[in-house]
Amino acid sequence: MKSTGEATAINIGETKSASATTVATTKAIQHPKAGLKRGLAIFDFILRLSAIGAALAATTTMGTTDQTLPFFTQFFQFQASYDDLPAFSFFVIANAIASGYLFLSLPFSIVCIVRPHAMGARLLLVICDTVMVALTIAAAAAAAAIVYLAHNGNSNANWVAICQQFDDFCQSVSGAVVASFIAAVLFMLMIVLSAFSLRKH
């Protein structure tokens, strides 16, 4: 009887020791995952700051684009402004919305840094980022088509290129379109990071 009791005591002790080892091993495995998620969240925050700069640059550059030629006739004054074209007006509105959204998304990005396993904030960001990348690309593509016509014209439609006369105007709108496409690419990278972070959840 005594030997049986001793064997039982030894088995119980070994079981507790194995359980403690399993818990310690599990914590050691989970810690690198938390560190990876936090690193992804920090990179996401940096991308959002960069996207804010790109979207704001696109908005302000396009929104302040205006050029008046130094010569005019008795009845005409040659002027080019962004609000003369609906595509450019849509471009300014879309990038302004994207800029505002990026500012509002910063607190949620910080939450993902502080709490790497918070799935709700990350899921909200990936949904809104997807909407914003669609809006930004649509605006940039529409404006890019107008910029192409301004540079090259269209002989079939008898549309002449205007960039030889309005060179400052064309340079400004071209730069704004490039900045908007950069913002769209940054949005795509943020979506990839969010999807990867959710996959590792």
Swiss-Prot record:
GO cellular component: Casparian strip; plasma membrane
Topological domain ranges for the Cytoplasmic compartment: 1-38, 111-129, 197-201
Segments crossing the lipid bilayer: 39-59, 90-110, 130-150, 176-196
Database matches in Pfam families: CASP_dom (PF04535)
Localization (cell): Cell membrane
Full protein name: Casparian strip membrane protein 2
Main location: membrane
Keyword Transmembrane: yes
InterPro entries: CASP/CASPL, CASP_dom, CASPL
Naturally occurring in which organism (per UniProt): Vitis vinifera
UniProt membrane topology term: Multi-pass membrane protein
Similarity annotation: Belongs to the Casparian strip membrane proteins (CASP) family.
Upper taxonomic lineage: Eukaryota, Viridiplantae, Streptophyta, Embryophyta, Tracheophyta
Superkingdom of origin organism: Eukaryota
Assembly and binders: Homodimer and heterodimers.
Residues in the Extracellular compartment per record: 60-89, 151-175
Record-level GO BP terms: cell wall modification; cell-cell junction assembly
Function: Regulates membrane-cell wall junctions and localized cell wall deposition. Required for establishment of the Casparian strip membrane domain (CSD) and the subsequent formation of Casparian strips, a cell wall modification of the root endodermis that determines an apoplastic barrier between the intraorganismal apoplasm and the extraorganismal apoplasm and prevents lateral diffusion.
Keywords for the protein's UniProt record, in alphabetical order: Cell membrane, Cell wall biogenesis/degradation, Membrane, Transmembrane, Transmembrane helix
